[in-house]
Amino acid sequence: MNLYSVARVISLSVLCAGFAFSQAAAGDLPQVGQEAPAVTLPSQDGSQVSLKEFRGKWVVLYFYPKDNTPGCTIEAHNFQRDLSKYQDKNAVILGVSVDSTESHQDFCTKQGLTFKLLADTEKKVVAEYGSLSDRGFASRNTFLIDPEGKIVKVWTGVKPSEHSEEVLAALSELQKN
């Protein structure tokens, strides 16, 4: 086997391993129709917030990488901009990252955010939702949870500038049925 063939075999092996790893990670996402995994985490004001508190409401549970970064700020601003539309649809927004409550408080103050941001510093909830990146941050994924606590829609790798509108459209469509 010549050097070119060896390099080619190694390259293909690495590609296949990477693909298999990414598929395994994607398989860890809770699926549509599943009961949403339990969430109890501290928010920016230090209070404990539990997903079960919101039974009877729609929940937009969105995971994002880091406070005060460009994409995360755009996404948060858009959710804040549309907050009254979500409230009109009996929906709450909960953001989750691995940042601390202090970081969330600073982010909310600087950006004028009034919805809850939850601090998963131990990365347990982020991992349970299949949203822990290999760099230790939350991946940009969102779960729409119905009033009975079931996951009805999942978005992965979202575009921050368009995402709130996508979620609102899906929520409107689901509420028609």
Where are these regions (language model features)?
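Structural microenvironment flanking redox-active thiols in thiol-disulfide oxidoreductases
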Residues: 71-111, 122-127
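N-proximal helix/coil linker or "cap" segments that precede and/or mark the start of modular domains
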Residues: 3-6, 10-38
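A short beta-strand-turn-helix
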Residues: 30-33, 39-59
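Structural micro-motif
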Residues: 113-115, 133-143
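Short active-site neighborhood of thiol/selenol oxidoreductases, capturing the structured segment around
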Residues: 51-73
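Thiol-/selenol-based redox modules, centered on thioredoxin-like
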Residues: 138-177
